[in-house]
């Protein structure tokens, strides 16, 4: 079998994942407004795909053609464009279908031609008092440099200003970062009707208000467009430049980076399309996509709650871990010292972690706090706690990852604010991102210093903890806390040798340990001992690890995979991966936690990790995986994994065809894993 038959291209696998998101928008069992929001998630994902994956592919094509090689990447580009076009056609059809369904529920998203006289008057007042201040036309002439002016992934209206036989052009930015994209209009008869209008259409209606008095014209026509830029940046090293200065400079590069996709309204006149392509220096490698009247559907993620309660998901109130609420504990440290605590978001509340850090910030017994941040919430209480801790005389060290994609600017801001407050801020070495999810609290207890550690699979982010599934392990077990301390020492001194007996730490020992554990399963299978591998990942694309899993399958090891996103491995290939089953689940929460389970001859090993099985995570980032040493907590993770693999509602097969076929229910009972996990955790969190 040829090499190309053993692996799915990661870009195509990623698009298949986004098509699963689109399936959720099409799923009539989902509430109507949630289906609209899935359209927004699909659109947001696709924007990121073009910024990152497509831009990387474009660079590969340019390099290979400069070297005179026959580029496989060019063939892949064609496959991508074909797949995106087909999915986008499905998107357009779904959007129209959902508009009709909303109308049946008395929710009307109307355009500027459907306004009543009363609504027209109301809109002009709204424009004058709330919107006009944010509108400044960009006139397109010979001197205009649109590459410098246009913002990445913003929607613009390209306006024809027609006077006789002369046509001039201007651009209007849709200011959806300053004004809501969805605007509720005053109701008409009957009163139960709920009309809304998009910001785009308000500008279309008010074109005269924008241009009158400044231009002579016979007609104004507006067409929507959007440009996506390459999200990569170059870190040009200079002896006198700090990493923060380099990142700030590189972010400015991103703002004017190469366009990689140009989407425009399908009926935009060809002459205007040509002007925009020329001004944006759109090359033949870029994706030029004619589309509908509206772009930036990512704003539909925040589609407002309107209409009846059954149009959105029934809420699942986040659960408290009742161990923290026992009267015998004076604080969170007492609870964790007595036994390890495992939290699983968003089923559990993130409040426990926030409260522990708040307590640490003023507890007289706390000596020091170390934490690493990758993506934090906009109004982060964790940052506030670190600042308060510094003000209270604690020794506070915050490791800020300045190279967290799309969060670089926010992290530069946090780094400056923390430094000003007296916090010791350190950064990763360039090229070695810190993706681990750790904190370490050192506390004086009697004559001893006791350490409390957090090892997680997700970010310290209050917002994503409500949307992403992730684990937090809180422990005072010295076997783990001593090694978390070593990780922080390694971060501060990345070129000093360091060893770990319990933790799996990239780039130190992850690949070696994973290979050893897979090889042990192979040996056990060959000896007739219990064997098996179960993995829950966001992405599985490292060829070395994929090949090791193929070898395990060939030796009779049963491999079960739950991969949300990219998966290069092809299950069920005869003679290669007969013993590998792979599924993916897309539902109301984003499956984000990483879990590795090895049968280990009957004594299961369960690991929680920040690392996906991608080359960058294994070899070029600082990642941490921890074994679950407490048998109770180990069983809890195993139970949750069993529920996920029993899903008969939201699980799809991962296969060679990228078909996204749903796992058939057959005669099994209906199990929607995320709802079943909520019930499972709720059953555990009952008062004594």
UniProtKB/Swiss-Prot annotation:
ATP binds at residues 45, 468, 564, 592. Coiled coil: none annotated. It holds the Pfam family PP_kinase. This is Polyphosphate kinase. The gene is ppk. Keywords: ATP-binding, Kinase, Magnesium, Metal-binding, Nucleotide-binding, Phosphoprotein, Transferase. Its cofactor is Mg(2+). GO terms for cellular component: polyphosphate kinase complex. Transmembrane segments: none annotated.
